[in-house]
């Protein structure tokens, strides 16, 4: 079954809200799997929370990429380097992708409780910052109308 293109499902803000909801759901699942001691799964869901949060930010511009690499690269270039989002967060996003990849594909990777907790913390922080950024942007546009 063909998935609808993000531009076919409503306004840009509809797509932003949907992607933020998916990011929140992923973060909730990361917390649940973490509490159950399923650290590999929690790393996966924390990363996807980060990824869907970034996709929400890019959706505000009407931008979407097919590959994660392109999405993360664009976000770092256009949001982290100009310090719309903190540079330290950019480094944590790169680390999150590496850990998710190891958790998913390296059968000998042992996901630690500490690193997984850091991943979840990073996901929560970027979601918080993105929601604040997107809300501020939306309010500014409404005031201009």
What are these regions (language model features)?
Residues 1-145:
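Terminal alpha-helical segments
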């Amino acid at each position: 079954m063909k998935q609808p293109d993000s531009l076919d499902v409503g306004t840009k803000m509809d797509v932003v809200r949907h992607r933020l909801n998916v990011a929140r759901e992923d973060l909730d699942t990361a917390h649940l799997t973490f509490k159950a001691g399923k650290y590999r799964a929690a790393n996966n869901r924390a990363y996807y929370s980060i990824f869907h949060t970034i996709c929400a930010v890019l959706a505000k511009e009407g931008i979407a990429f097919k590959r994660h690499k392109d999405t993360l690269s664009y976000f770092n270039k256009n949001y982290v380097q100009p310090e719309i989002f903190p540079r330290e967060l950019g480094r944590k996003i790169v680390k999150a992708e590496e850990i998710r990849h190891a958790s998913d594909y390296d059968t000998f990777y042992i996901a630690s409780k500490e690193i997984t907790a850091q991943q979840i913390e990073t996901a929560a922080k970027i979601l918080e910052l993105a929601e604040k950024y997107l809300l501020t942007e939306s309010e500014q546009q409404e005031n201009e109308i």
